[in-house]
Amino acid sequence: MKIRIIGSVGSGKTTLAKKLSEWYQIDYFETDRIVWKREGIEVRRTDAEKIATLKEILQQENWIIEGVHLEAWATESIDQADVIIFLDLPKKQIRQQLRKRQIKQLLRIERAHYPVRFNMLKKMFYWDDLFDQRTKPLIEKRMMQNPEKWLVIKEKNEIQEIEKRMAQYI
């Protein structure tokens, strides 16, 4: 089973990837970790490094890849996926989840893979707006090419139903 999860920042991609990983006993990978080397300081990988890292993951029999990235280096993960889950949640839900995440990270209740700063919430709101303006139209266009591969989640409570809905792809 090859699963690709796409959605805006704060839509629940990582949470869902972890759940699916546990349910199906499949390793999950975050595209952010493909893009960024996080060894003390954050360094963006070159396109060649990203492609090589992704290629290594894609060679596995089963995988779950989550992330917002749709650039050329990441498209192979969409092409090879058996199912693509698009978390298309309402902006109000995403903003609420981002606020909760920021508070938990600042209080050190939840770990982050990036430096947690007070201005990060503002950046995430900006990235969410960019997703709606730039990425979402690209996703909608790709969905038309292979609609049978796509599973669109419009509300957070639908995520709880996903195991039932995933049965059709197994």
Report each predicted region and the residues it spans.
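Walker A (P-loop) ATP-phosphate-binding motif of ABC ATPase nucleotide-binding domains
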Residues: K2
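The conserved Walker
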Residues: V9
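Conserved lysine of the Walker
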Residues: K13
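Conserved substrate/cofactor phosphate-moiety recognition/catalytic segment
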Residues: K18, E22-E61
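NTP-dependent small-molecule kinase module
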Residues: W23, W127-I170
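Glycine-rich phosphate-binding loop used to anchor ATP phosphates in small-molecule kinases
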Residues: I51-K92
